[in-house]
UniProtKB/Swiss-Prot annotation:
Protein name per the record: Arginine biosynthesis bifunctional protein ArgJ, mitochondrial
Sequence similarity: Belongs to the ArgJ family.
Pathway connected to this protein: Amino-acid biosynthesis; L-arginine biosynthesis; L-ornithine and N-acetyl-L-glutamate from L-glutamate and N(2)-acetyl-L-ornithine (cyclic): step 1/1; Amino-acid biosynthesis; L-arginine biosynthesis; N(2)-acetyl-L-ornithine from L-glutamate: step 1/4
Gene Ontology biological process terms from the UniProt entry: L-arginine biosynthetic process; ornithine biosynthetic process
Transit peptide, from-to: 1-23
Origin superkingdom: Eukaryota
Record's catalysed reaction(s): N(2)-acetyl-L-ornithine + L-glutamate = N-acetyl-L-glutamate + L-ornithine; L-glutamate + acetyl-CoA = N-acetyl-L-glutamate + CoA + H(+)
Function description: Catalyzes two activities which are involved in the cyclic version of arginine biosynthesis: the synthesis of acetylglutamate from glutamate and acetyl-CoA, and of ornithine by transacetylation between acetylornithine and glutamate.
Record's subcellular location: Mitochondrion matrix
Quaternary structure, from the entry: Heterodimer of an alpha and a beta chain.
Family annotation (Gene3D superfamilies): arginine biosynthesis bifunctional protein suprefamily (3.30.2330.10), ArgJ beta chain, C-terminal domain (3.10.20.340), L-amino peptidase D-ALA esterase/amidase (3.60.70.12)
Binding site for substrate: 198, 227, 238, 324, 463, 468
Class in the EC hierarchy, top level: transferase
Length: 468
């Protein structure tokens, strides 16, 4: 049974107004694209320049999807001069939003070919909106298609509040405006990144160059933007991502290479353990940089898969760094496991444990919470046969904090026995913005990594006020 201290009970008895006042010092996040008031600590993650793929143009336009928004872009458009090979990974939530249903069907119909753009609105998820919601998603695509002189060539994404219909007339009337604003500059890409944001405090945009073994003299480009700060947990979370490349990736190779990358990036992060209705990560390749077409089973395929996985990991980590109420970026690494599946499940369980996350926020070296999460991560559900969890052997288990400044790890548990923890050293490590929790299972040679953040008072404030 959980007990409460007298202090805690007195706080629970406080009038609502007093409780609100006690958190009044916490800066609130506006539910819309980030403004000029980007936190100083986050500005370092916003690029000041970039190198963008040939043939793609983008824009961000103010529509006012939420009536309260009159100043920030909330409609994003990406187009390609030529048809693209395309693939997407979608949420596994059973209540899939209308744009997810629409876009999945489109890619199946087109065989991952002939896609020429993506249209995205923020401010309304168009989720759990019935037949009318599907019609609205189709209207968004048709409006963009009309601007391009195409048909069935546009992927649709939406993000925002669930259960509300889109102001569809307002959106489709502004799609031509979004089309006329298209451009390929860094500022255009950054504006698009801002347009897909909701509770994000900064736009998330990355661009890189790379080469492939068969065309060492050709410089390829890849660029992508993503959004997400809450309701983040595989598979996937309120997370939208658009990645574009001018490399010639075949339509048959694109789905597998994207799934491989997403499993090791966007599906390896968690903010709060909630999986959204709208998650979509789409990859478009128009081949305009030239070179040999990339197909499965070739050195080019392996090389591009590595490039995309690293690129996707960088994008996914930006989401964690902008987690709602987050003050820390935490890497959870589980090694020496009997299986990769077990390592992933353990890392995921630790990463989403509220007790672990609040201890990290409080700078409390409470390794018992880490061990507790490890211990229950693989146990059977009550209705299932008992699993003795051979992947976890208590006397083989080790837990450490690993500083990111290159200094020695702080051992907390060694072979199932607690260490005499240097609390002063632990406090120094927990004071850092970045830290790693390392769990060695001692039962094999497999491993997995997750990225998460802490929980602060601000997380409650943001989500308590989400619809207001």
């Amino acid at each position: 049974m959980v007990g409460f201290s007298r202090c805690a009970l007195s706080q629970l008895r406080q009038p609502k107004a007093q409780l609100v006042r006690s958190f009044s010092h916490i800066p609130s996040r506006a539910y819309s694209a980030p403004s000029s008031s980007i936190p100083a600590a986050k500005k370092k993650y916003i690029p000041t320049s970039g190198t963008y793929p040939l043939g793609f143009q983008v824009s961000g336009t103010i529509v006012g999807v939420k009536p309260s928004n009159t100043t920030k872009p909330d409609l994003a458009l990406l187009t390609s001069e030529v048809p693209c090979a395309a693939a997407a990974v979608f949420t596994k939530n059973k209540f899939q939003a209308a744009p997810v249903t629409f876009s999945r069907a489109l890619l199946q119909k087109k065989g991952n070919k002939g896609i020429q753009g993506v249209v995205i609105n923020s401010g309304c998820a168009n989720a759990v909106t019935g037949k009318g919601g599907l019609e609205d998603a189709a209207k968004m695509a048709q409006a963009a298609d009309k601007c391009l002189g195409q048909s069935d060539s546009i992927i649709v994404m939406s993000t925002g509040v669930i259960g509300q219909r889109l102001p569809i007339d307002k959106i489709i009337n502004n799609v031509p405006k979004a089309h006329s604003a298209l451009g390929g500059s860094h500022e255009h890409w950054l504006t698009m990144a801002k347009a897909i944001c909701t509770t994000d405090t900064f736009p998330k945009l990355i661009s890189r160059t790379f080469t492939l073994p068969s065309s060492p003299g050709v410089e390829y480009r890849i660029a992508g933007t993503t959004k997400g700060a809450g309701m983040i947990h595989p598979n996937m979370a309120t997370l939208l991502g658009v990645i574009a490349t001018d490399a010639p990736i075949s339509s048959s190779a694109l789905p597998s290479v994207l799934k491989h990358a997403v499993d090791r990036s966007f599906n390896s992060i968690t903010i709060d353990g909630d999986t959204s209705t709208n998650d979509t990560v789409a990859l478009l390749a128009n081949g305009m940089a030239g070179g040999k077409e990339v197909v499965e089973g070739t050195p080019d395929y392996e090389a591009f898969r590595e490039v995309l996985t690293k690129f996707s990991t960088e994008l996914a980590q930006l989401i964690v760094r902008d987690g709602e109420g987050a003050t820390k970026f935490v890497t959870i690494k589980v090694v020496d496991s009997a299986s990769e599946e077990a390592a992933r499940k353990i890392a995921s369980t630790i990463a989403r444990s509220p007790l672990v996350k609040t201890a990290l926020y409080g700078k409390d070296a409470n390794w018992g919470r880490i061990l507790c999460a490890t211990g229950y991560s693989l146990i059977s559900e009550p209705s299932e046969p008992i699993n003795d969890v051979p992947e976890i052997v208590p006397e083989n288990t080790n837990v450490s904090f690993v500083p990111t400044d290159g200094t020695a790890e702080l051992k907390l548990l060694v072979n199932g026995e607690p260490e005499q923890v240097d609390e002063a050293r632990a406090a120094e490590i927990l004071e850092l913005e970045d830290l790693e929790i390392l769990v060695r299972l001692g039962t094999g040679d497999k491993q997995a990594t997750y990225w998460t953040c802490d929980y602060s008072h601000e997380y409650i404030t943001i989500n308590g006020d989400y619809r207001t």
